[in-house]
Amino acid sequence: MRNIISKVNGSILHTIFYAKDVSKKRIDVIAEKNILQFSASGLKNKQSFRPHFHIPKKIDYTETTSQEAWVIIKGSIKATHYDVDSKILNEEILNEGDVSITLLGGHTFEVLEEDTILYEFKTGPYLGVKLDKVFIKDETDPYLQTK
């Protein structure tokens, strides 16, 4: 596991959790102050847990942004993580079973293998691109180079 720290404000912006880091004991990867939580556990055959519901709670969205996680199911990607000032902090190849979590800051990825499968989880509600995203203007952005 690796935390990617802002050079601007010193906070954890992104966390990479590698499939190789899964252990038999549950690991709570993301601090409980965040709206998006992530834990990992290596499980035994026939293992179970007590059936349950979750208790409703009020969540204050005024002090946070959308948080998002990508889980690589098959294949690989090159993840790029940005600081709060839009500068690149990290570029990294993620493979099957690896997870990228963005708590704050920007991100993008490039698919490296045909038929890659990625699951994306994020806090909601998603209200469409105009109300959800601010695009980073970066001279290395391939979307800007094609215009």
Language-model features: locations:
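Hydrophobic/aromatic beta-strand elements that line small-molecule binding cavities or substrate pockets
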Residues: 41, 69-70, 106-107
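A short, N-terminal "cap"/entry segment at the start of jelly-roll beta-barrel domains
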Residues: 1-44, 92, 145-147
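Glycine- and acidic-residue-biased ligand/ion/polar-headgroup-sensing regions
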Residues: 44-45, 64-82
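Short beta-strand His + acidic residue motifs that chelate non-heme Fe in jelly-roll/DSBH
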Residues: 51, 79-80, 101-102, 107-112, ...
